[in-house]
Amino acid sequence: MRDQFISLALMLCILHSACGLYFHISETERKCFIEEVPDETTVIVNYKVELYDPRSNGFMPSSPGIGMHVEVRDSDDKIVLSRVYSSQGRISFTSHTPGEHVICMYSNSTAWFSGAQLRVHLDIQVGEHAIDYANVAQKEKLTELQLRIRQLLDQVEQITKEQNYQRYREERFRHTSESTNSRVLWWSLAQTVVLVCMGFWQMRHLKSFFEAKKLV
């Protein structure tokens, strides 16, 4: 029981983490990120693009003509989302298959501005982190206690999805291991059969050779 409580606490800590970062790209460069997402889980991506200004030697808000093309592919390599957004935006999608989702971003600017340096601030929120609870409380007129219970229920639901996803990964890994072991077994049997046939053929060949030379 104590181990289960510790595991639950660790998973809650993991779920409370968020992916916030920034990276530099040129206007013709493509950057992709992999996010493991359970099925039927909401993912929200917040981003902001800044353009390098050589006069101030810093990054400034990008011009209106520069936007970001965002493409999301699921674990089956199917396109979930693909469209052009402005230089700052909020993207939301829901996963329908569990597994690795690839989020790719690149500038939609033309070659006239190629070579310019961009800084992209990126924040990826998965599951209950993607829910705006302040907005939920205002719409549904929830008290602080009711809102906290709602958050806990969403966290439990997300933990259940994570556990189901881990079972799915374990099942896939077991299937891959069993398939590999089966192929190794059949390959070993095939090698054994080939070696036996080669030995039999060599014995027949040597016997025919000795008989032809009248040594036997």
Swiss-Prot record:
Primary location recorded for the protein, binned into one broad class: endoplasmic reticulum
Can the keyword Transcription regulation be found in this entry's annotation? no
Motif Prevents secretion from ER: chain residues: 213-216
List the subcellular locations: Endoplasmic reticulum membrane
A GO BP entry: dorsal/ventral pattern formation
User: InterPro entries from the xrefs?
Assistant: Emp24-like, GOLD_dom
Keyword Cell division (UniProt): no
Q: Which loops or segments lie on the Lumenal side of the membrane, by the record?
A: 21-182
Q: Which domain of life is it from?
A: Eukaryota
Spell out which residues lie on the membrane's Cytoplasmic side: 204-216
Q: Which family does it belong to?
A: Belongs to the EMP24/GP25L family.
Q: What is this protein called?
A: Transmembrane emp24 domain-containing protein eca
> Which species does the entry assign this protein to?
Drosophila erecta (Fruit fly)
Supply the gene name: eca
